[in-house]
Amino acid sequence: MSATTKLAIGMAAGVLLLTVAERRAQADSNEQYFPLQSYRVGPYAAGGSGFFGGFIDYMQLVNLRDNGVNGVKLTWSECETEYVVERGVECYERLKKGLNGAPTAATNPLSVGIAYATIDRQTVDKIPLITINHGRTDSTDGSVFPYIFPLQLNPYSEIAAIITWVGEKSGGLEKLKGKKIVTLYHGSPYGKETTPILDLYAKKYGFEITHIEVPHPGNEQQSQWLSIRRMKPDWVILRGWGVMNPVAIKTAAKTGFPVDHIIGNIWSNAEEDVRPAGSVGKGYIAITTGPSGTNFPVLKDIEKYVVKAGKGNLADAKRFGTIYYNLGVENGILNIEAVRVAQAKFGKRPLTGEEVRWGFEHLNIDDKRLKELGALGLLQPIKLSCSDHEGGGAVRFQQWNGDKWMTISDWVHPDRAVLRPIIEASAAKYAKEKGITPRNCSAEIHASLSR
């Protein structure tokens, strides 16, 4: 036997051993993996550390209290992005193949920029991309974006709810005519996402809209607020993030703009956004998809099984039950319920991203299930489908009393009759640009029902 032949046989044997080892690892693993593109340093650390802290603590709870999901333990690892797009993409590529044989369920980068940069990759890789309360609005249309899920609230629904509430405060939407509204937005894809829908509503209801950008990270806003003071708007919509939010509140107060006429969006609604502003933050208003507080059975279980066991993820225990932390818990519930739904169809085992995608698309969490989860009142009921990857769409308004958030409204729902055609048109344009043939959602639903 020649040396060349021996080398070829040796290489083939090596490849075979590697393949067998990989298959054995996958077979031996009884874990479901969540790669976490987290950020715990930098100007957005408060949001990242709170959110991922809540997400991780919920997964810990499911492992410690329930022995995982039907016996399948949850596992995860973090990759620090600092909210930088390039690092987020690097983290995705590094972690997407799973961990020690445990397959990847979904990614949750909590970053519009990172989400935009990985949409195409994750669609090809068949790994769900979860953008709770943010992301591309048109990814609501699952016929074009099968692997992207802007759960609970897309950016257009957020704006629609805010305009509806402002209209109610003005005596009706028709009373918005002649009003002045400013949107002060973070200079990023996230901040710019809602400009078109605000322009549409301004034209529809006759109010004057002015868009003012605050460059990243937002720690200097004097010129922007001086401009706002000159304009004398009736309302300011704050679409901030991280350090931009307390700076906005403090600068508004310095220039004499009333903080109770500033409405913070879904990423300008946390304790960390108002407490640094001190006493001048009292009266500030913001929207939320879920309240702060610990008076929920699921939070009490996390405290019992995770925190008191010394396995809590928060560096500062005082942040337990805050807006960012509770949103992480909400996100954990939605991710794990998707796994549970998918297991009911595909088996009680670790699942592929493609199988978990099916689980997300068939989520139907009603009040009964929320009560079973100990999360009734923590998050709104949510039902997803092939054509609707958002599912919720409602917000509540809250006001800072100087110490804590007080809910000041019931659920405010977006006008989907206005939004849906815009979403579908944008998704269709994207599909044409990318050469995507949209799924026939009606046919898929019919086929599913006929089985």
Regions found by a protein language model. Give the residues of each.
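Beta-alpha junction/loop-to-helix N-cap segments that form part of ligand/metal-binding clefts
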Residues: 29-33, 46-53, 60, 64-142, ...
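Ligand-binding clamshell of periplasmic/extracellular solute-binding protein-like
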Residues: 81, 85, 103-116, 131-139, ...
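Extracellular/periplasmic Venus flytrap/periplasmic-binding protein
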Residues: 87, 97, 137-138, 146-255, ...
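Extracellular/periplasmic periplasmic-binding protein-like sensory domains
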Residues: 145, 252-332, 411-415, 426
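Venus flytrap/periplasmic-binding-protein-like
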Residues: 81, 129-131, 136-140, 217, ...
